[in-house]
Regions:
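Intrinsically disordered, low-complexity regulatory regions of eukaryotic regulatory proteins
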Residues: 13, 17, 21, 33, ...
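Residue-level detector of bioactive/disordered segments in secreted/extracellular proteins
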Residues: 24, 128-130, 248
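Phosphate-handling DNA/RNA-contact segment within nucleic-acid enzymes
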Residues: 71-213
Length: 276
């Protein structure tokens, strides 16, 4: 029996890539890497410089699977991992549609539960917006600015109460897009916003917008010929305002400016801004 357990744990360590002493760090820290095909494609296609790409990896804790896929971790404001989406990209930085996205949670379920489909289906997976952890990091930065201003005020520096209030309350607005790729790229080029991603048109819900309710929120759905994406997200925004009092709007930027051909291709904000 002891020998059986020994072989089992040895195989498990090999499967998870831990043929070394046990690593107690969170999973996203263990897997954080700029070596994915996605990260290399960002630079080679001119979306980012090498330095910008490294910043984005740190910002979103991007990971890399053994087979070169990028791991988009979904981490909440408390630093808890909800899940991780493994996606594959071609050298031109477009999705490799021959390789379907996979969830880290599903891989773990299959690893530990085998082929018991009924048991696997009975264990739900919870998701949040990609980039949700940035909200708490933003709050920490603003709190430190507030503390510094308060200290200056006490020591006699001419910092008024209104200025203290501004430092404490003006959090950056949040932009929500469909694709994780879009959020990653635009975070380096339009840093006046915090960039989050729903992970798909139908992945955005009012509940997922609740953690953002202290921020001004702007939704940027992809475009299409029939306004389906815009209408869908407009309904979600209305529900978030009704349930949680969110200050949320849906940007008509793509609907007003995209050409009929671009709408037919269902472009997103990166496609429009970079025109690649």
């Amino acid at each position: 029996m002891e020998e059986l357990f020994s072989h089992t744990f040895k195989a498990l360590r090999h499967e998870l890539g831990h043929d070394r002493p046990c690593d107690s760090r969170p999973m996203w820290q263990q897997r954080q890497s700029a070596d994915s095909d996605f990260c290399r494609a960002l630079v080679s296609n001119g979306y980012m410089t090498e330095a910008q790409m490294q910043h984005a990896v740190q910002r979103y804790h991007l990971g890399c699977s053994r087979d070169g896929g990028v791991i988009f971790w979904q981490i909440d404001t408390l630093g808890q991992i909800f899940d991780g989406k493994i996606m594959y990209y071609r050298p031109d930085c477009h999705r490799d549609h021959e390789r379907h996205p996979q969830w880290v949670s599903n891989r773990l379920k299959h690893h530990y539960l085998g082929d018991d489909k009924e048991l696997i289906a009975s264990i739900p997976s919870c998701h949040c917006l990609f980039g949700t952890h940035l909200l708490s990091e933003e709050l920490i930065v603003k709190s430190e600015e507030f503390a510094t201003a308060l200290e200056s005020s006490v020591s006699g520096s001419p910092v008024g109460n209104s200025q203290l209030y501004t430092l404490n309350s003006q959090l950056r607005p949040v932009a929500v897009v469909e694709a994780e790729k879009t959020a990653v790229i635009l975070s380096e080029h339009y840093s006046a916003y915090l960039w989050l991603a729903a992970g798909g048109l139908f992945e955005l819900t009012a509940e997922k917008l609740f953690p953002l309710h202290h921020h001004r929120i702007v939704l940027f759905p992809d475009t299409d010929p029939d306004l389906k994406a815009y209408t869908r997200w407009y309904e979600v925004a209305h529900e978030a305002r009704r349930l949680y009092g969110c200050n949320v709007t849906v940007s008509p930027l793509l609907e007003l400016n995209a050409t009929p051909e671009q709408k037919q291709r269902k472009i997103d904000l990166v496609d429009y801004l970079f025109k690649k």
